[in-house]
Amino acid sequence: MGLQAGTRQLHGNLILLPVAVVMLLLCTSPVCATASVGLPADCSRLTSSSPSGVYVIQPAQSPPRVVWCDMDTEGKGWTVVQRNTYSTEITWKESWTTYKYGFGNVQGDHWLGTEYLHLLTQQGTYKVRFVVRDKANVTHYAEYDIFRVESESSGYPLRLGRLLSSGKDYLTSYYSSYGGIHDNMKFSTVDKDQDQHSGNCASSYGGWWYDRCQNVLLNGKKYILWPEICPRVTACRPSSWSNPPMCADCARGWGSATIPSRSPSLPSPITATHTVRNQLQ
């Protein structure tokens, strides 16, 4: 499969989703310094008894951010940075500035923001887990021991380390039959084309780290792409046989957390699934 097959269900309310789920989760290795008194630098700084839910974090050199912390996934303390489901109202074909600062709702579909991904991953060594659930309710994941997004001035390029899970590596290996490679590619949007393709991949598919378009695509409105699980655009197209619509092979995805433009007071945690944590805790 390209992703390692895992449990047939996710913790919390994810099990209620009868379609494919995609999630992008972050976890940090070294202990991160807390940017402000009382605010953790990421979800890994929460106590192990903390429930999954909405929290306010403050990475170094960043204003406070609202995120979804997953305290149920193995290891606990995962920071959810993207979520994309079958019923999303997000087009994912947003501008550079919109992607930079993030959009959506942390309790639903959202994008943390490329700038905040950069600030978050500058604090230490982070690992990442991409999670996909297929229509048979089987969960697959790909985990990398290093995840980093560089600065805006360099184009927010993606840096990935070694694949820790089993299966083919469609992010750091080059596949000429698909879209090339994703590792070390700059981020592209509809109004800022930084891919290696003759056209603008983002104008067709949404913001992502493209080479000659993609092997893997998690930021799409009508489909997700992951070879051997969601191998074709038409394979993951929503169909009319279910309400809400479900896709033929994979439906939609889950990822991380959304960030509001202003930092609210710390809300009470809301029970749910995916979070970020410090590996040394």
UniProtKB/Swiss-Prot annotation:
The set of disulfide-linked cysteines is C43-C69, C201-C213
Where are the compositionally biased (Polar residues) regions?
270-281
- According to the entry, every stretch annotated as the Fibrinogen C-terminal domain falls at 34-246
The cellular component terms of Gene Ontology attached to this UniProt record, alphabetical and capped at eight, are:
collagen-containing extracellular matrix; extracellular space
UniProt tissue specificity? Expressed in smal intestine, colon and lung.
Lineage, top-rank taxon, reads Eukaryota
What are the alphabetically sorted keywords of the record? Disulfide bond, Signal
UniProt-reported outcome of changing H140R: Abolishes cytidine deaminase activity
- Tell me what the record says results from E143Q: Abolishes cytidine deaminase activity
- List where Low complexity composition bias occurs: 260-269
Q: State one molecular function term (GO).
A: cytidine deaminase activity
Which stretch is the leader sequence?
Answer: 1-33
Q: Which Pfam families match?
A: Fibrinogen_C (PF00147)
Q: Which InterPro entries match?
A: Fibrinogen-like_C (IPR036056), Fibrinogen_a/b/g_C_1 (IPR014716), Fibrinogen_a/b/g_C_dom (IPR002181), Fibrinogen_C-term_domain (IPR050373)
Disordered: annotated segments: 260-281
The free-text function statement in the UniProt record for this protein reads: Shows a cytidine deaminase activity on 2'-deoxycytidine (in vitro), however shows no RNA editing activity (in vitro).
Q: What is this protein called?
A: Fibrinogen-like protein 1-like protein
